[in-house]
């Protein structure tokens, strides 16, 4: 989910797509947010040679903590991240925290540190967003441009865990990717499958 959808689901904000409600939620992108959960790790998983935490989508500026150790900082919502957590996990309860920095504050830092001006889309509705000095910062963030406003949607500069987080463990090798291609020929379908394997060095 995202900060906005989680706040809606917990009845903290009203639907920002209704009427002019977007104007009432512009404070959200100026704050820092924290997600926290517990991972119960069994001995079977802990005994595996490889244990990785895979983040398929984090939007955008995050710090990932496992049992109070910062393992990674991110700044791009368009890519995935994989972290070796074998030496950071313990048997039983583990605490995973993801802290999200304000994309507006980060964007302002990057904008103000630049010694020259660059073109910025008029779709960046900084005025509605009540951004300091109406400064447009969309091009300084590796996140979806439409979050900053567009003619077809509201300005909702959100953050959050927008794709799955997966804890994976394995020995010796794993299936990294599977690609299946189908070709139809008359009354017959021919299916080709390519399977990519990753092996440990040993």
Predicted feature residues:
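Predominantly extracellular/luminal regions of secreted and cell-surface proteins
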Residues: 1-11, 158
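Surface-exposed, low-complexity/disordered Ser/Thr/Gly/Pro/Asn-rich loops and linkers
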Residues: 15-26
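Accessory beta-strand-rich segments of carbohydrate-active enzymes
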Residues: 25, 29-174
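Beta-rich accessory regions
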Residues: 44-45, 184-185, 199-201
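Beta-strand-rich binding/interaction modules
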Residues: 64-66, 188-202
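Residue-level structural signal for beta-strand termini and adjacent loop
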Residues: 76, 179-180
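Generic recognition of flexible, low-complexity loop/linker segments
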Residues: 151-152, 180-181, 194-196
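Short, solvent-exposed loop/linker segments at the N-terminal edge
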Residues: 181-189
């Amino acid at each position: 989910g995202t900060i906005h959808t989680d706040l809606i689901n917990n009845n903290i904000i009203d639907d920002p797509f209704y009427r002019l409600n977007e104007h009432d939620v512009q404070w959200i992108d100026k704050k820092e947010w924290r997600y926290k959960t517990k991972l119960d790790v069994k001995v079977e998983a802990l005994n595996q040679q490889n244990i990785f935490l895979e983040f398929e989508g984090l939007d955008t500026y995050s710090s990932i903590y496992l049992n109070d150790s910062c393992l990674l900082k991110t700044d791009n919502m368009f890519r995935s991240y994989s972290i070796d957590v074998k030496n950071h996990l313990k048997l039983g309860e583990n605490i995973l925290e993801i802290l999200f920095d304000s994309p507006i504050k980060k964007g302002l830092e990057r904008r103000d540190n630049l010694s020259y001006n660059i073109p910025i889309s008029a779709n960046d509705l900084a005025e509605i967003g009540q951004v300091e000095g109406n400064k447009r910062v969309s091009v300084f963030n590796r996140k979806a441009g439409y979050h900053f406003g567009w003619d077809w949607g509201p300005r909702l500069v959100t953050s959050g865990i927008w794709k799955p987080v997966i804890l994976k463990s394995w020995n010796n090798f794993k299936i990294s990717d599977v690609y299946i291609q189908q070709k139809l020929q008359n009354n017959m379908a021919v299916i080709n499958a390519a399977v990519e394997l990753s092996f440990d060095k040993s």
